[in-house]
Amino acid sequence: MDSIENTSWCGFYLCDTVKEILYLGPYQGPLACTIIPYGKGVCGRAVILKETQLVPNVHEYAGHIACSSSTNSEIVVPIIKNNIVVGVIDLDSDLFDNYTLEDVEILEQVARIISELF
């Protein structure tokens, strides 16, 4: 990724509202967790809270799901359509404290644009 540096994994998880799970969508990087229950890990919490999760140190995040042992920081932005989370954008970094509030703003804009496709 050119505009958000030091990202080791970037992808989408899409919501299955019946089963209350996120399933892996398009991504760039090594194979990740394919199914995440709502409320579990950073992605699942973003769905439940309907808000961005900025995690400078995943090892200090209670309930973090380690899809890759090299991940040290993460940002997850919900994609919301008509007040319903339809998916999330998930970025991981091998560096601690890699993501900034500017990254949050950029990804939240991207999520708003993508939400129009649902």
Give the residues covered by each predicted segment.
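Regulatory sensory and allosteric helical modules in signal-transduction proteins
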Residues: 15-67
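Short hydrophobic/aromatic beta-strand element in the GNAT-like acyltransferase core
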Residues: 9, 76, 88
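Juxtadomain coupling helices with adjacent low-complexity linkers
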Residues: 93-118
